[in-house]
Amino acid sequence: MIRVCIAGNSGHAATVTRALPRLPQVEICGWCRAWPGEPMTEVLEDFAKLGLTPPEYPDYLTMIDALSPDVLVVDGLFCDHEEMTCQALARGIHVYCDKPLALTLTGLDRVREAAQSSTALLWAMQTARFDPWFYTAKQLIDAGEIGEIRLLTAQKSYRLGQRAP
């Protein structure tokens, strides 16, 4: 069994819970809010649909120290991703972290150094990476079908205001 802890739901943590039916070897062993009062609606609804009742912990450090999971899902405030990721990697815990990994280049260097000195793996939540439009573009680029790329700009559009759950 791959034991996974979820810390927060401020971005894409639900990509993990929604994949659980296809991942019988994965067990959610604990979860916590990444900041006081953080709504965990999507993740908790997914737990309920799947009949899961993993224990809640007061914070991610208490959780990972108590459970020693294989993987920590980092999905808190952007300003906390760097520290949460480095703490998990220092403990040999694999990290699946939402973007951004860090807010500064110095912070990103710290994350890189933590990953390089750890036995654990670091994976950023590039959730659209294998969507057909991105995957096709990557294949065309790799095959040299569109020539040398000199500039690339892209934007995923979001509606202004609050998004529906």
Show the residue positions of the predicted features.
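Short, Asp-centered acidic motifs that coordinate Mg2+ and/or phosphate
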Residues: G30, D70-V71, L151
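Short catalytic-loop micro-motif centered on adjacent basic/acidic residues
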Residues: C5-I6, V73-V74, V95-D98, L122-Q126
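Beta-loop-alpha module in the N-terminal Rossmann-like domain of NAD(P)-dependent dehydrogenases
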Residues: L52-A114
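N-terminal Rossmann-like dinucleotide-binding module
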Residues: M1-L50
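A short helix-to-beta-strand connector/capping loop
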Residues: A48-P55, S117-L121
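Rossmann-fold dehydrogenase core element
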Residues: R110-A128, E148-L152
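Predominantly a Rossmann-like dinucleotide-binding segment in NAD(P)-dependent oxidoreductases
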Residues: A128-P165
